[in-house]
Amino acid sequence: DMPGALGQGTNTLIDQQDGIPRHQISVRNFQESEVNIKVDGKVDEDIWQQVEQYDNMLVAVPGTGAPAEYKTEYRLIATEKGLYVSGIMYQPPETLVKRRTARDQSIDVDNFGITLDVSGEGLVGYWFYVQLGDSVMDGKVLPERNYKIDWDGPWVGKSFVRSDGWSGEMFLPWSMMNVPSVKGPRNIGFAASRTVSNTAERYQWPGYSYSSARFVTALNQMKVEGVEPKQQVSVIPFASVTSDQALEDD
């Protein structure tokens, strides 16, 4: 009986906004030295099968709140160095929309992503998207939906085309975000998302519509232990970021 076999993953209901639920989950912590994930978008390392998969996405654009048509397997792994995020996006391969764009150029393309409120206080979120074709987007979002693209962090994200859809992976170093020091477990706010360009839909968990009163202050929560925030790294030019650099301490 596999965890998340229903596609839901183990979660606790926090509350609802406009009838849309938000949840708390627990994210497993590993030592960076035992993870050995190559960020290539394939999601083929054994360790991904050791953690729960989640699929609680609803249609947020247009704001119907309906269950997503296509299945998404969303997984999270925390280490002392950062957060690994993977998505397997099931859909008929002929419906995939793949274009390569410059960083932070938002066009009509399939993507998956995450928004993180690392302080858990609802003051600022960092958002990260990997597009099919490996373009990436990132920035900050202030309450409730004030998006800024003038922040670029040293992280890595990749996509991969499968016979049953596509998949993606990202590694997000804690050191590029303003992570407060906390004794013991911490709550990090998060929203998971996916764009299906072919149907002009955006899936999200929590699946609030864009007209909802709250977003940054009403994210899901992930309970994480073992996070070791380092001095924030100075932002390095994106062209020079490699997996190794993203994993470096300093």
Question: What name fits each language-model region?
Answer:
Residues 1-250:
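Structural preference for beta-rich elements and adjacent junctions enriched in aromatics
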